[in-house]
Amino acid sequence: MKKFFQETNIKEEKGDLFSIEDSSPIFAHCVSSDGKMDAGIAKQFVRRYGDGLQGSVDGFEVGDAVPYKNGDTKIYNLITKEKYWKKPTFKSIQSSLQSLKNRLVKNNEEKVYMPRIASGLDGKNWSKVKAKIKDVFDGSDIQITIRFL
């Protein structure tokens, strides 16, 4: 795998997100608080890990990082917008990343895998989103692997 972006704890590489070699992976991806996951990478998560993933965000708000467990796999739904058709803000992206970090630290979780969040269907500039990830996780011991095709 060719590495495109490497920080001390943040690695970006080309490859299928779902082909990682980890027996108990922890994923994170962006969703809306209305629970609609009918397109993009969210649809792939639902197809692989079940329809319960969509209902897991009920009652949560923008800025939350909502965990969902399926067997040995954990998925953090980063709620970055209210409705599936809206676009996230950089503030909501940063808030959900901070919530993710807080949950990972609290649960002694040291690794998370994610796609290039908010830059596909949500249309955010990847360089700016990547800077938010770096701002939130810089200096932490959490290893982040970002995969893209």
Could you describe each region identified by the protein language model?
Residues M1-L149:
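Macrodomain-like recognition of ADP-ribose-binding/processing modules
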